[in-house]
A protein has these predicted regions:
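Polytopic alpha-helical membrane proteins, predominantly small-molecule transporters/carriers
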Residues: 1-184
């Protein structure tokens, strides 16, 4: 039984909403509540690991647990990205390069172990563990890359959002799931 949702249009809508919640949630805890990035990372890493433990224990896809794990990942990923840039002072460029390296390493180990990187067929504990590690790094990279594009490249948030939306929409237009039975 697949342990993650099939990627359909509704998935992308929920993903965007959850990622937006992650971005604003991380900023709310780190800046508005003045907890700082370290405390926010600590709190939400524990929450992420708790939901992930439940998710892995279930051995099946459960929408509530999946999206709670996803959202906690988005919050901790955003806080990590901001920590790398602002607290460590590495900036968006170096932070993005580090995260790309980490993501490529995780994907390489995942492929070596599972002989596949398909998210359409996550059926084992090991595959799902790699999925969530890659997912957390990708969330962190997404925040860093978005900030890099908007700030470091100087194109601004509106153009960056339009560019990324266009790329996503062109991908969705050409996407054909392996299994037509879809759920989120």
């Amino acid at each position: 039984m697949n342990r993650v949702p099939h990627i359909i249009f509704l998935y992308w809508i929920i993903k965007i909403a959850s990622t937006t919640l992650g971005e604003t949630g991380a900023d709310m805890f780190s800046m508005t509540f003045n907890l700082g990035y370290g405390a926010t990372i600590s709190i939400f890493m524990v929450i992420f690991l708790m939901f992930l433990g439940i998710k892995l224990f279930l051995k099946r896809y459960d929408p509530l647990t999946y999206w709670l794990t996803f959202t906690a990942s988005a919050i901790v990923g955003t806080a990590i990205s901001d920590f790398i840039d602002r607290t460590l002072g590495l900036g968006y460029t170096i932070g993005s390069i580090i995260l790309i390296g980490l993501l490529l390493a995780v994907l390489a180990f995942w492929y070596i172990k599972e002989k596949s990187l398909s998210v359409e067929n996550i059926t084992t504990f090991t595959a799902e563990t790699f999925y969530w590690i890659a997912f957390l790094i990708a969330n962190t990279l997404g925040t860093a890359a978005g900030d890099f594009l908007a700030d470091s490249m100087g194109v601004g948030f509106l153009f960056s959002a339009a560019l990324i939306t266009g790329l996503l929409m062109s991908h969705l237009q050409n996407y054909q799931p392996e299994n037509k039975a879809s759920y989120t």
